[in-house]
């Protein structure tokens, strides 16, 4: 069974790019634009990795990450923050919020794929 990545991203173009890159690398994707749905989807699908946009309309991606990490059944799933925040201190704040890794937008495609594979291995 292929490994899966849940993408939590409200921007349609970013969602399509991330989905295309991840699926082209041989992984399955579960997608939502709504941070409030992320917890239920994670429980239902048990993804191997979660890509989390930090700036979501309903609730911050860091808040969603906190909920995931507070859940005994989901806390083991690595969360990679994908965000336009690129100021000094942002990466540290994001890692302290529970994210295992951080990718800044606009993404570097090779680095994006390399980061995904570092958590999932080859598909």
From Swiss-Prot:
Residues 4-120 form the Response regulatory domain. GO terms for cellular component: cytoplasm. SMART domains: REC. It holds the Pfam family Response_reg. SUPFAM superfamilies: CheY-like. InterPro entries: Bact_response_regulator, CheY-like_superfamily, Sig_transdc_resp-reg_receiver. GO terms for biological process: phosphorelay signal transduction system. The modification 4-aspartylphosphate is found at residue 53. GO terms for molecular function: DNA binding. Disulfide bonds: none annotated. Interacts with DivL, PleC, DivJ and PdhS. This is Polar-differentiation response regulator DivK. The lineage of its organism: Bacteria, Pseudomonadati, Pseudomonadota, Alphaproteobacteria, Hyphomicrobiales.
